[in-house]
Curated annotation (Swiss-Prot):
One MF annotation (Gene Ontology) recorded for this entry: N-acetyldiaminopimelate deacetylase activity
Family: Belongs to the peptidase M20A family. N-acetyldiaminopimelate deacetylase subfamily.
Annotated protein name in UniProt: N-acetyldiaminopimelate deacetylase
The protein's annotated pathway: Amino-acid biosynthesis; L-lysine biosynthesis via DAP pathway; LL-2,6-diaminopimelate from (S)-tetrahydrodipicolinate (acetylase route): step 3/3
InterPro entries the UniProt entry points to: AcetylDAP_deacetylase (IPR023905), Amidohydrolase (IPR017439), Bact_exopeptidase_dim_dom (IPR036264), Peptidase_M20 (IPR002933), Peptidase_M20_dimer (IPR011650)
Function (record text): Catalyzes the conversion of N-acetyl-diaminopimelate to diaminopimelate and acetate.
Length: 381
């Protein structure tokens, strides 16, 4: 039984109403499992890890496995779309389109459950993309080991592309990210007696200024990186010298090499400031599973060639995005390709008004199913 467009739209609307935060997607996971259990089971094996669902399709040839991953979590956003199928969970919304992601994955899975593939396939319904490096945690759990893909694919919806348009590029699609948390600890005191205190506002200001040299003086200017310090907190009132300064920010880089370089420079600068101001330092640079999504040359060339030459697919080559995606961790372990699916919305990802066009669902299912069928036939393993 291949799921039809009206069924997929109903599934999407059902999922849209029950968004849940990462590793708390219990209702979502149960709903997905209900749909999966309704598909032909002859070649299916299913297992769960926390709120993740792994579905393995036994192909005619069992010495190669193609993977497909979707994320399943929502965001802590209060929905304001006014849709009749708006979120029923207060303060929760599928504001990043993961309801679209899941629905497309179910549509593709339903085809291959009904038409046995040439090679094995593993479908990964992954929790906690937004907040907790769910892909990395699932991979490191070992639950994927027996069904480990030899190559893997995933999509992300794109409000800026027309509904159903496929976008992709060789190289990096999403930047790798790293959170910066720095605290300088000195000594508070009266504003009139600075010599009896150790002013962390000044220390923090020096840190902010020196961080600006990383992009301009340590990184190849041809390569895109961003270091943003978005939070600076120190002091309580104007006549008290602050003994503590908390600074938080983010790193964005299109290669893991540059991400690690920037992390090293941030740490070195923070340690230098602490030494020069004779203060204590607490620093946490947290990347987790948010590696750059660096598409594999082989799988991406095959993907782009298929999409470019398929009459029923509108394809565009896209630029890299400086946003993060935890598929970067999986693709650092398994060669593969991530791509965009256009959903044509005037509102951006993570907006409380995001309302993807539903015609993108079937167009996405058809394009991806067509590619995976073609990929299966072209492989000679």
């Amino acid at each position: 039984m291949t799921l039809q467009e009206n069924e997929l739209i109903k599934i999407r609307r059902d999922l849209h109403q029950i968004p849940e935060i990462g590793l708390e997607e219990y209702e979502t996971s149960d709903y997905l499992l209900k749909i999966i259990n309704g598909l032909p089971q002859e070649n299916l094996e299913i297992k769960r890890w926390k709120t993740a669902i792994l579905v393995h399709l036994n192909g005619e040839n069992k010495n190669y496995t193609i993977g497909y991953r979707t994320d399943i979590d929502g965001l802590p956003v209060e929905e304001k779309t006014g849709l009749p199928f708006s979120s029923k969970h207060e303060g929760r919304m599928h504001a990043c389109g993961h309801d679209i992601h899941m629905t497309v994955a179910l549509g593709v899975l339903s085809y291959f459950a009904s038409h046995r593939p040439k090679y094995n396939m593993t479908f990964i319904f992954q929790p906690a993309e937004e907040n907790a490096s769910g892909g990395m945690k699932l991979y490191q759990s070992g639950e994927l080991d027996e069904w480990m893909p030899d190559e893997i694919y995933a999509l992300h919806d794109n409000p800026q592309l027309p509904a159903g348009t496929i976008g992709c590029r060789k190289g990096t699609l999403f930047a790798g990210t790293c959170e910066i948390h720095v605290k300088f600890i000195g000594k508070s005191g009266h504003a009139a007696y600075p010599h009896q205190a150790n002013d962390m506002v000044v220390a923090g200001a020096q840190f902010v200024n020196q961080i600006q040299t990383i992009v301009s003086r340590n990184v190849d200017p041809i390569q895109s990186v961003v270091v943003t310090l978005g939070h600076f907190s120190a002091g309580t009132t104007g006549n008290v010298i602050s003994g503590v300064c908390q600074i938080d920010g983010t790193i964005r880089a299109l290669t893991q090499e540059n991400n690690l370089l920037i992390q090293k420079r941030v740490r070195t600068i923070a340690e230098g400031i602490a030494h020069s101001f004779d203060c204590e330092l607490e620093i946490d640079l947290h990347q987790g599973g948010y590696y750059p999504v660096e598409n594999d040359d082989n799988t991406t060339e095959a993907f782009i060639n298929y999409m470019k030459n398929e009459d029923d697919v509108d394809f565009v080559e896209t630029l890299p995005a400086m946003t993060g995606e935890d598929f970067g961790y999986l693709i650092s372990k398994i060669p593969g390709t991530m791509f965009w699916l256009g959903v044509d919305s005037p509102y951006s990802l993570h907006s409380e008004y995001l309302a993807p066009k539903e015609e993108s669902i079937m167009l996405g299912v058809n394009a991806i199913t067509g590619y995976l069928k073609n990929r299966q036939e072209s492989l000679n393993k």
